[in-house]
Amino acid sequence: MDGIKYAVFTDKSIRLLGKNQYTSNVESGSTRTEIKHWVELFFGVKVIAMNSHRLPGKGRRMGPTMGHTMHYRRMIITLQPGYSIPPLRKKRT
């Protein structure tokens, strides 16, 4: 799964889980059809809708100069009723 980076767990994304919608950050160059194909192939689910938005990068100071991080894209994926994505495993610390 090259295009999907990681799942996002914010207040809004946790609320959307009740509507069978899953949120994840993806590579900014990925298209909707690529992400839909990867999700359906990897998780074995049926996607009925996808919403995406681009989030801006953050400013980072490096001494006297100001830099920034790259922007990224977030996808909200809606699955057909009856399908679900299994919970993701936590990283070991």
UniProtKB/Swiss-Prot annotation:
GO CC entries: chloroplast; ribonucleoprotein complex; ribosome
Presence of the UniProt keyword Iron in the record: no
Molecular function as annotated in GO: mRNA binding; rRNA binding; structural constituent of ribosome
Pfam families (alphabetical): Ribosomal_L23 (PF00276)
GO biological process, one term: translation
Keyword Metal-binding: no
Localization terms from the record: Plastid, Chloroplast
Keywords from the UniProt entry: Chloroplast, Plastid, Ribonucleoprotein, Ribosomal protein, RNA-binding, rRNA-binding
PROSITE patterns tied to this protein: RIBOSOMAL_L23
Domain of life: Eukaryota
Listed InterPro entries: Nucleotide-bd_a/b_plait_sf, Ribosomal_uL23-like, Ribosomal_uL23/eL15/eS24_sf, Ribosomal_uL23_CS
Function: Binds to 23S rRNA.
Description of how the protein assembles with itself and partners: Part of the 50S ribosomal subunit.
Family to which the UniProt record says this protein belongs: Belongs to the universal ribosomal protein uL23 family.
Full protein name: Large ribosomal subunit protein uL23c
